[in-house]
């Protein structure tokens, strides 16, 4: 999985040589096309609702844009990311053209997670409007 630009050609070649799919996070349809042209196997289409570094386009808008933009790349899978927690949200993403979803924050609340109990409680009690985007950690916007 690559999060910073197009993976180097040698990495893509190694993945293919060993049967390991290569994925990349994308926040715009233009980035998705560049990744597909480079030979990436899986596009993690990360909307503004996604945790961590995310783009400016919402998941609901971005997924169908990317699905249409890369439709000619038959071997590229699309995973929707950003604000997906329930089966209904997963079904909606798939109805918009995703082949599946990439979830993140929801796993912090599982029994298996090493997240502290206090943080788990806060995550589960939080409302959907209680996340923020900030540059405080890396200088680039990140959902926290």
Question: Residue locations for each model-derived region?
Answer:
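Conserved active-site-proximal phosphate/metal-binding subdomains
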Residues: 56-79, 85-144
């Amino acid at each position: 999985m690559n999060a910073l630009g197009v993976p180097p050609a040698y990495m893509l070649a190694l993945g293919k040589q060993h049967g390991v799919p290569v994925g990349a996070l994308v926040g715009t349809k233009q980035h998705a096309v560049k990744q597909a042209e480079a030979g990436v196997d899986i596009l993690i289409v990360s909307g503004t609702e996604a945790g961590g570094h995310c783009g400016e386009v919402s998941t609901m808008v971005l997924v169908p844009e990317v699905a249409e933009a890369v439709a000619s790349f038959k071997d590229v899978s699309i995973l929707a990311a950003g604000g997906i927690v329930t089966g209904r949200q997963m079904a909606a993403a798939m109805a918009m053209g995703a082949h599946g979803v990439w979830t993140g924050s929801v796993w912090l609340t599982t029994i298996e997670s090493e997240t502290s109990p206090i943080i788990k409680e806060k995550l589960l009690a939080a409302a959907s409007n209680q996340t923020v985007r900030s540059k405080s950690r890396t200088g680039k916007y990140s959902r926290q």
